[in-house]
């Protein structure tokens, strides 16, 4: 029997760094790596997210985070408390932090087409820069406020679910 066409052999040969298990909240993410996570408190949020974020840094992956501008410093402090050298990661291009106005709410409103393009650009850029993966963490509390375009959020998430399977990168 010729095993050269055996799909199992092909998968073994295709094994790369990006095929390492990606852990989140005590589970391993599968092929679908878009997770919507809800938390009861900031402490719970960081108890779940910090090991996921740290794992990416330990593997020399890129981190791209979007946060509430009012919580920027607290977010950076939480990363530092996990042993992440944020200034070094920023200088090395391994970490980028944007606030809502520079991502979801450019020009003061949510434009789903523009946001979908940004996510694809970020994930493509990470690959082009030589990172095995980009771990994208996006805080979306802005969606609870009355920003123009927020009514398009469900459609945006649906469209995002059609785009993300093209990538191995986890998006939380």
Language-model regions, residue ranges each:
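Non-catalytic regulatory/interaction regions at protein termini and inter-domain linkers
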Residues: 1-172
């Amino acid at each position: 029997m010729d095993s050269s066409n055996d799909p199992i052999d092909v998968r073994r040969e295709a094994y790369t760094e990006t095929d390492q298990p990606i852990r989140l909240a005590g589970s391993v993410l599968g092929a679908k790596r878009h997770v919507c996570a809800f938390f009861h408190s900031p402490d719970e949020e960081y108890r779940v997210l910090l090991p996921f974020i740290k794992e990416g840094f330990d593997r020399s992956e890129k981190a791209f985070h979007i946060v509430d501008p009012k919580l920027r410093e607290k977010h950076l402090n939480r990363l530092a408390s996990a042993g992440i050298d944020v200034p070094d990661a920023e200088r090395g291009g391994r970490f980028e932090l944007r606030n809502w106005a520079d991502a979801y709410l450019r020009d003061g409103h949510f434009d789903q087409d523009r946001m979908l393009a940004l996510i694809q650009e970020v994930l493509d850029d990470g690959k082009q820069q030589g990172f095995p993966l980009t771990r994208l963490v996006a805080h979306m509390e802005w969606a609870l406020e009355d920003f123009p375009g927020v009514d398009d959020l469900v459609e945006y998430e649906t469209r995002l679910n059609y785009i993300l399977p093209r990538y191995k990168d986890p998006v939380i």
